[in-house]
Amino acid sequence: FSQTYQDMFVLTMLKGKTDGRYFEIGAADPFKGSNTALLERLGWTGQSVEILEHEVEKFRKLRKNPIIHADATQLNYNEILSGHYDYLQVDCEPPTISLKILKMLPWDTCTFGVITFEHDHYADVSRKIRKESRDFLSSKGYVLVAPNIAPDNKSAYEDWWVHPDHVDPEILERMKIESENALNAEKYMLFL
């Protein structure tokens, strides 16, 4: 399902959890490249957000968890999100939108175990999104485990984060060591 094994990274960091909860911003296709389809099949519950009507229609026909058809920059996340989520995906186009949404989330009332954030550094003319998102998530207590995920080892487009209070410390330590040596996402799947 996932483009570069994001779903497997989530499962690795959460020790194969089968009853998790996710929030997905930028769902796109319900299966192709989906970071939550496998999680849903494993019993996870969650909610997705997507702006494209044709993707929302497919999603509603093919997936069981709900989807919100909306411009993600126009949502009131204080009304939608509360408590703990095991996984957060932020993947909107262009990357300036992803950063704007990241900063809109209710960080005082929500926690996330694992976050995949698409910064599209390879296409970011300003070269600011990756640094700003990293500074922001670090300030919230998140740890960057897998920086600069790239499907082709060249086009860095995404960072993978965890909150140390919500993942196994041994797995976190092993992943941090491995991340120093790996660019390919496949190398991060060590523990399942």
What do the predicted segments below correspond to?
Residues 1-78:
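SAM cofactor-binding core of SAM-dependent methyltransferases
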